């Protein structure tokens, strides 16, 4: 295809209506779906990209991942393919412009900017919870609908293509410079990264929407200047650029753009809430930059009603969540596995220039600057010089970040086709019955009777398993419960350990209505090693044949409960201890 498509021409069955835009990655057209009565956004990728065999393979895989994302703030992917040697992808058509267009048209007010970031944050929290990193967060990818009434709709676009580009290092000079303006330091430095890189980029995007400038402006030697800014300069302030914005907004952006990913917000939603509070003067009592957290997947709810009435992240309802622990029930259809890709994303073909910039900046910086912005430092907690500081209480919003990423769980258990289900956000009454009745907590966590709910301030459970095969699946259950203080967590651990001792070294009987007969479970005598209590449960009957390794521990105000079902006995024992220790290591204290 030597020239761009004209109106009325047909490409891969799609009838072209008009061009919507063009860039280094390709051209986007409004095109009529060949089978359905609707128009879609058809992106035809540049010939340079389409010719690259590695990119083609990655494009197909990442487009499939993007097609599995289903969220009102994410542009839906309908189809992808190749035609006449060109790769293409058909997406939901959003009738409107994007946030970059609105900024240039001088219609991006401060209130609108904070609203747009809040809507994008919903999309990011959902994607991160599925194990998907966007990698190219910038205002041009924030599509704005022309709503007839009510709130403006915001959709995040270009998931799959950005990921595929990042893995191959193919793009154009213009695309590279646009991406550099929002790139996280760990990405530019060639380090491993996760969803928190998206949060840094979202902080850069908010700065741009509020001020009309990129955080680190490019002049002569554009790539060098921008990379140097991201790596070594403190986050810029908005209060001295935009009348009416306070130091509180400076602190919010400073946290989002922290050089150390562990000092950023624990979720995009937490960032958006803090930005709205800074703009409107909402309640921010007690808010400080977040403690280190290894993995960003979700957000906490605004305080108000009881914690169990507030879902975490983008989840709004969990009528029948998959239960944490043994025995496995009939889980909903699993999602496709999402993978955090931890390899270095080469920023582009001209990243040779950017790499040189990193080298030049590093070599000329005899002492890297680590100054903390005054506004952020003012919000940091202080401690007495004579009294050792107490570890901070772990709050509800930080619980998801304590769990290992999906890829790490796969490595722990040695199984790669695991998928994560929707999280469990409150204790769940088990399906079925057990004899003796008090032994439910030994079989699996999350049973309401195991906790004094009046002392619980946060609850987060995640079940990860294989797609259904008709046999007992390999399954990992992770549950973390935050209590009002450390003493309460230790009391709950002691109570659970007592139940385990009473239920260990015997046979307990499970029954569920869908089973033909009860299941006999043999339980081992609990063992305690390095503060972790473990128990093994096995079923060898005709209804179910499975082994479960179960572990509980507590640190600070958090109770940790992990169980693993796998036929590989040695792997299960190692994995349940490994995952428990991983979580404990991330809890302050």
UniProtKB/Swiss-Prot annotation:
Keyword Lipid biosynthesis recorded: no
Catalytic reactions on record: L-seryl-[protein] + ATP = O-phospho-L-seryl-[protein] + ADP + H(+); L-threonyl-[protein] + ATP = O-phospho-L-threonyl-[protein] + ADP + H(+)
Domain Protein kinase residues, every copy: 14-276
Record's bilayer topology term: Single-pass membrane protein
One Gene Ontology biological process: regulation of glycolytic process
Binding positions for ATP per the UniProt entry: 20-28, 43
Disulfide bond entries: none
Reported modifications of this chain: Autophosphorylated. Dephosphorylated by PstP.
GO cellular component terms given for this protein: plasma membrane
InterPro entries noted in UniProt: Kinase-like_dom_sf, PknH-like_Extracell, PknH-like_Extracell_sf, Prot_kinase_dom, Ser/Thr_kinase_AS
Catalytic residues of the enzyme: 136
Topology feature Extracellular, residues: 364-589
Predominant location: membrane
UniProt-reported outcome of changing residue 173 to A: Lack of phosphorylation
Region (Disordered), start-end ranges: 365-400
Impact noted for substituting residue 171 to A: Lack of phosphorylation
Compartments, as annotated in UniProt: Cell membrane
Residue(s) carrying Phosphothreonine: 168, 171, 173, 179
Side of membrane Cytoplasmic, spans: 1-342
Protein name, UniProt field: Serine/threonine-protein kinase PknJ
Organism: Mycobacterium tuberculosis (strain ATCC 25618 / H37Rv)
Organism taxonomic ancestry: Bacteria, Bacillati, Actinomycetota, Actinomycetes, Mycobacteriales
């Amino acid at each position: 295809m030597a020239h761009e498509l004209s109106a009325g021409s047909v490409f891969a069955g799609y009838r072209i209506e008009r061009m919507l835009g063009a860039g280094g990655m390709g051209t986007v057209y409004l095109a009529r779906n060949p089978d359905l009565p609707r128009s879609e956004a058809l992106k035809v990728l540049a010939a340079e990209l389409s010719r690259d065999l590695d990119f083609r393979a990655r494009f197909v895989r990442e487009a499939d991942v993007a097609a599995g994302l289903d969220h009102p703030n994410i542009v839906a992917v309908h189809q992808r393919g190749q035609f006449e040697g060109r790769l293409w992808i058909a997406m939901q058509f959003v009738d409107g412009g994007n946030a970059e267009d609105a900024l240039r048209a001088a219609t991006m007010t401060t209130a609108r900017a904070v609203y747009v970031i809040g809507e994008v944050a919903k999309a990011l929290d959902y994607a991160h919870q599925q194990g998907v990193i966007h990698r190219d967060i910038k205002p041009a990818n924030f599509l704005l609908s022309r709503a007839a009434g009510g709130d403006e709709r915001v959709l995040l676009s270009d998931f799959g293509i950005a990921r595929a580009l990042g893995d191959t290092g193919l793009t154009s000079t213009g695309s590279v410079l646009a991406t550099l303006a929002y790139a996280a330091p760990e990405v530019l430095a060639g380090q491993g990264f996760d969803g928190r890189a998206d949060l840094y980029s979202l902080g850069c995007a908010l700065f741009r929407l509020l001020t009309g400038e990129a955080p680190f402006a490019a002049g002569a030697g554009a790539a060098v200047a921008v990379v140097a800014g991201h790596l070594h300069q403190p986050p810029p302030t908005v209060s001295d650029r935009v009348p009416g914005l306070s130091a509180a907004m400076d602190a919010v952006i400073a946290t989002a753009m922290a050089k150390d990913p562990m000092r950023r917000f624990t979720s995009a939603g937490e960032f958006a809430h803090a930005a709205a509070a800074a703009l409107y003067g909402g309640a921010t009592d007690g808010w400080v930059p977040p403690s280190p957290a290894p993995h960003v997947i979700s957000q906490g709810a605004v305080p108000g009603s009881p914690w169990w009435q507030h879902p975490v992240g983008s989840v709004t309802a969990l009528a029948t969540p998959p239960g944490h622990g043994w025995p496995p029930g009939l889980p909903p259809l699993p999602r496709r596995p999402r993978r955090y890709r931890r390899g270095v994303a080469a920023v582009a073909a001209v990243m040779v220039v950017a790499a040189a910039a990193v080298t030049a900046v590093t070599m000329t910086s005899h002492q890297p600057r680590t100054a903390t912005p005054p506004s952020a430092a003012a919000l940091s907690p202080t401690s007495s010089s004579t009294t050792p500081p107490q570890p901070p209480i772990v709050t509800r919003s930080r619980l998801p970040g304590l769990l290992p990423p999906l890829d790490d769980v796969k490595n722990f258990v040695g199984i790669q086709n695991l998928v994560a289900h929707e999280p469990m956000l409150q204790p769940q009454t088990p399906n079925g019955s057990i004899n003796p009745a008090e032994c439910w907590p030994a079989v699996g966590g999350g049973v309401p009777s195991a906790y004094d709910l009046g002392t619980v301030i946060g609850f987060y459970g995640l079940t990860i398993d294989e797609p259904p095969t008709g046999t007992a699946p390999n399954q990992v259950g992770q549950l973390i419960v935050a209590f009002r203080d450390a003493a309460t967590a230790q009391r709950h651990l002691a109570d659970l350990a007592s139940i385990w001792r009473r239920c260990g070294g015997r046979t307990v009987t499970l029954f569920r209505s869908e089973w033909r007969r009860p299941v006999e479970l043999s339980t081992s005598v609990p063992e305690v090693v390095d503060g972790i209590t473990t128990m093994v449960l096995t079923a060898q009957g005709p209804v179910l044949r499975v082994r479960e390794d179960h572990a509980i521990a507590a640190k600070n105000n958090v109770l940790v409960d992990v169980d693993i079902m796998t036929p590989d006995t040695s792997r299960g024992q190692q994995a349940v201890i490994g995952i428990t220790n991983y979580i404990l290591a991330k809890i302050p204290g």
